[in-house]
Amino acid sequence: MKRLNKLVLGISFLFLVISITAGCGMGKEAEIKKSFEKTMSMYPIKNLEDLYDKEGYRDDQFDKNDKGTWIVNSQMAIQNKGEPMKSKGMVLYMNRNTRTTNGYYYVNVIKGEDKGKHQDNEKRYPVKMVDNKIILTKEIKDENIKIEIENFKFFVQYGNFKDLENYKDGDISYNPEVPSYSAKYQLTNDDYNVKQLRKRYDIPTNKAPKLLLKGTGNLKGSSVGYKDIEFTFVEKKEENIYFSDGLIFKPSEDK
């Protein structure tokens, strides 16, 4: 009888530990979603200039008269098996103080031996934004690059995360020492955002991607660190296909 009672107590304790662990994981998942929701709830922003009138999270890193700067970044990276990784994307710095936007379009080819090293082969093409249009600030000869820049759209302009709460049972990671955190969800090819990416990019795989929300800094809010959204289609040795997006709010450099 005593052995039976000990066995019952042992099993009960085990279930209690599992429940507490699961509860903590679910709580952290909710925290991560809430942290990203502050900016993801703004998607889509078809007219990027609307960001001049939107304020992000402010902390003591901001001067009181600084309205802040939005940094917008979207990139598509494709590495077919055994080939160099090719990535193209754009970064914009939207200064709310001056209501001006500058940045660059970039093209990079990373060979296997280059990984982990400083890249000198990245080509940047400086741009500015006027009336929600991206304009080259220097004349270039490459007509294909010109067309790519003219037609470029950031993910924040067409992405939609209204169903974020419906993403369940994510693979959650949290390191309070850094701090860093991430939540990963398996998507389907019927997902709205996946369809939008396939519509705009020639993605050489039929595999449905995983959505990765990853960041560093205080989960409750911080101008220090970063937050990235990534759609990972393929992640293997010498074969990678992913799309990354970022929308972060930082103190202005001209403050």
UniProtKB/Swiss-Prot annotation:
It holds the Pfam family DUF576. The keyword Membrane applies. Coiled coil: none annotated. A lipid is attached at residue 24 (S-diacylglycerol cysteine). GO terms for cellular component: plasma membrane. Residues 1-23 form the signal peptide. It is found in: Cell membrane. A lipid is attached at residue 24 (N-palmitoyl cysteine). Gene3D superfamilies: 2.50.20.40. It is a lipid-anchor. Keywords: Cell membrane, Lipoprotein, Membrane, Palmitate, Signal. InterPro entries: Csa, Csa_sf. Belongs to the staphylococcal tandem lipoprotein family. NCBIfam families: SA_tandem_lipo (TIGR01742). This is Uncharacterized lipoprotein SA0095. It comes from Staphylococcus aureus (strain N315).
